[in-house]
Amino acid sequence: MEWLNVLESHGQALLGPVAWMVVWSLVKIVVIAVPIILCVAYLTYWERKMIGAMHVRLGPTRVGFKGLLQPFADVFKLLTKEVVVPSAANKVLFVVAPVVTLMPALAAWAVVPFGPEVVLANVNAGLLYIMAITSIGVYGVIVAGWASNSKYAFLGALRASAQMVSYELAIGFVLVSVLLVSGSLNMSEIVLGQGRGWFAERGLTFLSWNWLPLLPLFIIYVISAVAETNRHPFDVVEGESEIVAGHMVEYSGMAFALFFLGEYANMILLSCMAAIMFLGGWMSPIDIAPLNWIPGWIWLGIKTFCVVSMFVWFRASFPRYRYDQIMRLGWKIFIPLTGVWLVVLAIWMQTPWNIWR
């Protein structure tokens, strides 16, 4: 990272320390936010292609080679549509709600490590920051349902908020379990902790990652992440046969697109968190020279892509659950299970068989 130090010294000399700090912060935000938005655009393309393949269809093929420009066509379509604000709606809150939904999904990336030293803010409470910032998104959903002054929107917002809060508890217990075995809230240290152990010393790094000893928690985390993002088969929030588009039913144009962007950005974020906490983050699966030459951010991207593809696979494979089944799964199965596993881990770590020493 020598070139970064040179760039920083020249920037401070040219603009002054305060102005350079502001400019450099904006540059880092753009460098992270723009690729995330592009990833969201092409996640929609991959979702349609993957589901099409599972249904023995072609998916989008019209715009660009193999439909590669379809996401840009969708963005252009939404940009040209009128944003209609219902006459009975609270106009200020109606406009603010989509922004409140999207911003936490982008702000959370500030502490996500893409490599050993590639992170916007390497804070010691990174995991706590992620837990706090991602819980704010539910307020955008509640505000959207209330501000729309529509029965369908309000019912959808109630469903969404209850579902998101329920599964946030299960995810929270899983994160506490990872904190327990890692001994740190720092995201980079959580990744580095997975590179130690008997298997890692013999080059089989992928067997030292947390997914193996914490396999039940990994499964619970992935399913809870699907429910947290209101994705199929937990998408009763947008049940077309019941409440149409839920809290988004009165939105159109770019206001609707911001909700859409927030949902897919959360999918990528939670998938990246799964890669960091359970799949070794930026580390290669086997400690050999050809794989170690591949940059860490590529390994993190591959692992995130695999978890995101599981979201799409669930959508194409499973029928929608009833609302009462979703709440029962969260409160009566996942939360008690994660609580029990937390106790089991605490006891395990006090025994001679503690593998995280």
From Swiss-Prot:
InterPro entries: NADH_UbQ_OxRdtase_su1/FPO, NADH_UbQ_OxRdtase_su1_CS
Bilayer-crossing regions: 18-38, 92-112, 127-147, 165-185, 206-226, 268-288, 294-314, 329-349
Pfam families listed in its UniProt record: NADHdh
Topology in the lipid bilayer: Multi-pass membrane protein
Function: NDH-1 shuttles electrons from NADH, via FMN and iron-sulfur (Fe-S) centers, to quinones in the respiratory chain. The immediate electron acceptor for the enzyme in this species is believed to be ubiquinone. Couples the redox reaction to proton translocation (for every two electrons transferred, four hydrogen ions are translocated across the cytoplasmic membrane), and thus conserves the redox energy in a proton gradient. This subunit may bind ubiquinone.
Entry's family note: Belongs to the complex I subunit 1 family.
Keyword Translocase: yes
UniProt name for this protein: NADH-quinone oxidoreductase subunit H
Tree of life domain: Bacteria
Self-association state and partner proteins as the record states: NDH-1 is composed of 14 different subunits. Subunits NuoA, H, J, K, L, M, N constitute the membrane sector of the complex.
Keywords, ordered alphabetically: Cell inner membrane, Cell membrane, Membrane, NAD, Quinone, Translocase, Transmembrane, Transmembrane helix, Ubiquinone
Enzyme Commission number(s) from the entry: 7.1.1.-
Species of provenance: Bordetella pertussis (strain Tohama I / ATCC BAA-589 / NCTC 13251)
Stored HAMAP family: NDH1_NuoH (MF_01350)
Localisation: Cell inner membrane
Enzyme class: translocase
GO MF terms, alphabetically ordered: NADH dehydrogenase activity; oxidoreductase activity, acting on NAD(P)H, quinone or similar compound as acceptor; quinone binding
GO CC, one annotated term: plasma membrane
Catalytic activity line of the entry: a quinone + NADH + 5 H(+)(in) = a quinol + NAD(+) + 4 H(+)(out)
Main location: membrane
GO biological process, one term: aerobic respiration
NCBIfam families xrefs: PRK06076.1-2 (NF004741), PRK06076.1-3 (NF004742)
